[in-house]
């Protein structure tokens, strides 16, 4: 028996109880492919070159290699059908790849789980394996996915797309039936309040804290307050209320977070050196500053008032999931929410003064994230990844409260899991031109200018 067949015999047996597959140390059979594996391409003229490479491997000699074959139209690679899938059961797929001369790995190196019925028809849409981490020269990709209704097998698809000079090697492939992860519930509260004639940042903050005490009862995981809670109602300029982080306002928010054992997010104005930022802070359950986000997209009015823009889209790994922050005018542009989603954000917390509800809904839908807003001239709500309002606080002095499930999958009837598809099909490698420039030239004056 070859090393491959021994591996399959010991580890790749599908039983009625569960499926556990391990494949590595690949050895080519007479047709050039390891047992069970075959080449797939949409058309012969766009097929890649596939081969077993005994020289490039991760743990034991022999990997599944795909070459772009000097063809810019190339798309395809290795496939293997695995029987013994149980409809409705959960499976964890893991594989490792090494890429050479691949311009954009995020969409050109593809792993998918293509679920099939007993008659080998598609049982729903394929699941893209989009989670990845570097491990030396190799990249680990993995996915936890639920087999659709009527699924009886799954085709493991390992592809290379439109990379004529590239080679990718796949190794250490596993598929395991695993326990249902169950719900991952997070309770969120978002506050609708607009203090007026407070004359001080401290008084405005006090009114927000008082409203939380009056409206938010029971356990919460995160509480969101609006943009600029230290300036609203005060009649003061940004520079007059700007403070350091940590500072007096984060200390008061920290007391709230600690007393409720809840994360708290809010917009304040931050001073660092000569710069003043429109900043959103995230306070952890112990009352410490977990992190901050400086508003990237400043409207002209804020620039003229002396604010400085930020330059990054951080995400924060909390004890319930991954959180991103946006502020107000950010919602008018696609890239803040997109950047947060590609970094793994599951919930975007958005302190906002006023903004476009339609664009906010688009940000949730296109990135398949929960979007939470707390605003003055913008509604206060909790929105799901389909853009549906789960809770809305319509009156001042009220709170929108909802419990969401971060493990819930939002599937499109025709397209499948759009979160996974977006992560793998997003073309960040195609650069947009600079606004106002045509073919690299400065635009001509027009309209009498």
Where are these regions (language model features)?
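Active-site catalytic loop in hydrolytic enzyme cores
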Residues: 271-343, 358, 362, 366
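A structural microfeature
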Residues: 124, 169, 291, 390-391
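Hydrophobic h-region of N-terminal signal peptides that target proteins for export
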Residues: 7-17
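C-terminal beta-strand edge segments of enzyme domains
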Residues: 136, 142-144, 315, 375-449
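Extracellular and organelle-lumenal recognition/adhesion modules and their flexible linkers in secreted
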Residues: 15-187
